[in-house]
Structures are given as C-alpha cells and as structure tokens.
C-alpha cells in the first residue's frame, strides 16, 4: 500500500475534497483549532467554507500527500462518532458540512 501511495504522489496525481454545507446531521464531529494545528491546510479550507450558503458546495484540489493525510485524519474522527450520509460529517463554528474525498 505504501508503494502505491509513493507511486501516485510521484506521478503528480491529486485528490479532490468535496464539501457541502448541510443542516445538522445525526453523527458528526467538531473541527477545532487543534485540528488546524495537526493539519494546517484544513484552516485555509475552513476559512473559505464559512462563505458557503446552506446547500452550496465547493471542491478543493489537494496534492496527493496532503489529501491522503486529511482523509486519514478525518476518517479517524468520523469513526469515533459513527457513519453519516457522507464520508465525513462535521461542524465548524455554527455550521455543519458533509464531505467526500476522491481522486480524479
């Protein structure tokens, strides 16, 4: 598996992080400043997410290494609260979001 990740990273592939602003999902986790310290790229994304209107969505292109790191981190946090209608469901500030991570 590590070999596959190295191969994909060296080929310059990227990952897309798709996020939609939602009403309150049943199972979600909260994004905090501690999460931003763990993965600084999240702060940049979440500052931008605050501009979304309810139901609006946005995607973010990430290099493979960053996308994989974010995916692993958010997967671990989601596993602590249970499944939701998206791969990840989270709250930041007063808003809720659903998200998926994908490759092109």
From Swiss-Prot:
Give the source's domain of life in one word.
Archaea
Q: What is this protein called?
A: Uncharacterized protein AF_0096
Q: Which organism is it from?
A: Archaeoglobus fulgidus (strain ATCC 49558 / DSM 4304 / JCM 9628 / NBRC 100126 / VC-16)
